[in-house]
Each structure stands twice: as C-alpha cells, then as structure tokens.
C-alpha cells in the first residue's frame, strides 16, 4: 500500500481522482453558470461556450485557459472561433467527470468575472 506522504503532487492528484456520480455532477453543475453535460459513457463531458466581441478577446481567453490548464495538469478540448470558444472538460483517466473538471470550469469562469 502506498502512503500519501510518499506520493508526488502529480501522483496524488491521479490517486485522488475518481469519476463523479451523475447526482454529484448535476449538483455541482448547479453552481456553474452555463455549463452543461454532453455525451455519455466514457465520452461524457461538461461543456460551455464563451462568447467574445472579437478574435483578440477570444485568443486572450484561450491563452489564459491554457495557462490554468497547464498548471493543473488537466487539459480541456477547445474549439476556437472568431467570437467564441467552446470548452469541453472530462477526465480520461477515470472515463468520466472528476472534481478536477469542475474546479477547472470554475477557474475558467473566474477569468471573465475578474475582467468585468
């Protein structure tokens, strides 16, 4: 058995991750405005479309998301367009949605709240 004190930060986050139940996901999504479930089974994810005035604002947001995602070692799928970015989060390791997905979603939302 591995002691938690012997795990590295990266090992610990993988060790602590688990797929959330549908009830847990719905409950936590209620706290995140604009996020919705998409897909099912191993392809289940949470998804949100962020809208912007122009391409520059969209790319600025994408760069900030990349910075946060890299720091969290958790990388969303992004679909980038002129005036919007679709962010899709799931945890491949657990074949579902984990607390890491929901934490990243809240951090991405905070980017826009900070700029208002």
Curated annotation (Swiss-Prot):
Is the keyword Lyase assigned to this protein? yes
| Pfam assignment, any one | Pterin_4a
User: Which superkingdom is the protein from?
Assistant: Bacteria
Q: What class of enzyme is it?
A: lyase
> EC?
4.2.1.96
In alphabetical order, the GO MF annotations are: 4-alpha-hydroxytetrahydrobiopterin dehydratase activity
Entry's Gene Ontology BP terms? tetrahydrobiopterin biosynthetic process
The UniProt keyword set, sorted, is: Lyase
Catalytic activity, as annotated: (4aS,6R)-4a-hydroxy-L-erythro-5,6,7,8-tetrahydrobiopterin = (6R)-L-erythro-6,7-dihydrobiopterin + H2O
On whether Iron-sulfur is a keyword of this UniProt record, the answer is no
Q: List the disulfide bonds.
A: none
Q: Which NCBIfam families match?
A: PRK00823.1-2
Q: Which family does it belong to?
A: Belongs to the pterin-4-alpha-carbinolamine dehydratase family.
Q: What is this protein called?
A: Putative pterin-4-alpha-carbinolamine dehydratase
Gene source species: Paracidovorax citrulli (strain AAC00-1)
Mind giving the lineage of the organism this protein is from? Answer: Bacteria, Pseudomonadati, Pseudomonadota, Betaproteobacteria, Burkholderiales
